[in-house]
């Protein structure tokens, strides 16, 4: 089935097993999250086990699907397989996983096979084999396969409008289109920006989009971030940004967003030992950007992040009290935390 079919299916029932694949990774990621949330909403005692290509273990996964939860709940197994790294995974593994789900239980399986643009032929071959296992399963329509294609611009805008409606976001079609264009028609980035805009809890303006969108003003802010990590004269850069018309509040907001993302990378790397941008950000930036995030994230320890976020709290508080150009006061202490 395709995305529209999946949406209709999920309105009526939940599958026991689902295989998500195709050429658009963002939809694979989005529907893994969506279906997981539906499973948990239907059975709050669900225990989730997440496996990536690097920690894939066939026997452990089969055991989780075969047995009941220790506390009488159910098991949800999620396989996020990056095709380029899926050496441990064999297509034939799918058969025992589906077999395990034939017995009466509330256990569930979600498989997301992320695309490999470097080897589309092999990806297609692997996907087709998995689809055949699903089609032959006695689970019948409880085991579904969904193929995603890169959406056209109008499809992306429709998807964003549906998300805006879900968030009760007051944004016109014209401004939604502007957000999409500012983000270079990147659906995943625009999707995440809607969540940020929803925090405002007010009708959205073009200025809101320019201030909060992930790419607006990024080049100037990147100069400041680079200065912080490379021990450059950040006060000169900050002064330049102010003279160019950048607001102190905008600079603070941009720094908060960046360091929050850094902390997410830091926590994810420390917890899993992996650097999975899709899991952290919800989309996959270019390799160079991911590597830079990871490198900078590990420059600080947990205590360092706490100190930086405390500075941001004070900066925001004093800004609300009417004090201006607080970067002159706080940027140097932040730089010293990064470069002790």
UniProtKB/Swiss-Prot annotation:
Database matches in Gene3D superfamilies: P-loop containing nucleotide triphosphate hydrolases
GO MF annotation: an example: DNA-directed DNA polymerase activity
GO BP annotation list: DNA-templated DNA replication
InterPro entries (alphabetical): DNA_polIII_delta, P-loop_NTPase
Keywords for this protein: DNA replication, DNA-directed DNA polymerase, Nucleotidyltransferase, Transferase
Statement: the UniProt record of this protein carries the keyword Nucleotidyltransferase: yes
Keyword Transferase: yes
GO cellular component: DNA polymerase III complex
SUPFAM superfamilies: P-loop containing nucleoside triphosphate hydrolases
Oligomer and partners: Seems to interact with H.pylori HolB.
Function: Could be the functional equivalent of DNA polymerase III delta subunit (HolA).
Protein name as it appears in the record: Protein jhp_1168
Species annotation: Helicobacter pylori (strain J99 / ATCC 700824)
């Amino acid at each position: 089935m395709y995305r529209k079919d999946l949406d209709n299916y999920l309105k009526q029932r939940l599958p026991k097993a689902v295989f998500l694949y195709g050429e658009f990774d963002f939809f694979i990621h989005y529907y893994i999250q969506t279906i997981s949330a539906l499973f948990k909403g239907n059975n709050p005692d669900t225990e989730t086990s997440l496996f990536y290509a690097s920690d894939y273990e066939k026997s452990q996964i089969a055991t989780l699907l075969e047995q009941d939860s220790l506390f009488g709940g159910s098991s949800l197994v999620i396989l996020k397989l990056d095709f380029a790294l899926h050496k441990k995974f064999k297509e034939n593994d799918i058969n025992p996983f589906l077999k395990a789900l034939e017995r009466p239980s509330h256990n569930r399986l979600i498989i997301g096979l992320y695309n490999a643009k470097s080897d589309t032929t092999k990806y297609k071959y692997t996907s087709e084999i998995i689809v055949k296992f699903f089609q032959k399963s006695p689970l019948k329509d409880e085991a579904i396969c969904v193929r995603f294609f890169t959406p056209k611009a109008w499809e992306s805008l429709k998807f964003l409008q549906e998300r805006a409606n879900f968030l009760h976001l007051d944004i016109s079609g014209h401004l939604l289109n502007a957000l999409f264009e500012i983000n270079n028609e990147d659906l995943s980035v625009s999707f995440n920006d809607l969540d940020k805009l929803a925090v405002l809890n007010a009708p959205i303006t073009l200025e809101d989009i320019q201030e909060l969108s992930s790419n607006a003003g990024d080049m100037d802010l990147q100069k400041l971030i680079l200065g912080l990590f490379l021990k450059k004269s950040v006060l000169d850069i900050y002064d330049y940004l102010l003279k160019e018309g950048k607001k102190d509040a905008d600079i603070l907001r941009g720094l908060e967003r960046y360091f929050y993302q850094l902390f997410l990378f830091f926590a994810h790397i420390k917890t899993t030992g992996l650097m999975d941008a899709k899991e952290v950000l919800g989309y996959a930036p270019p390799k160079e950007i991911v590597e830079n995030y990871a490198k900078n994230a590990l420059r600080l320890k947990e205590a360092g992040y706490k100190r930086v976020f405390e500075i941001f709290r004070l900066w925001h508080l004093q800004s609300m009290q009417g004090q201006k150009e607080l970067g002159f006061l706080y940027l140097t202490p932040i730089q010293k935390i990064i470069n002790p």
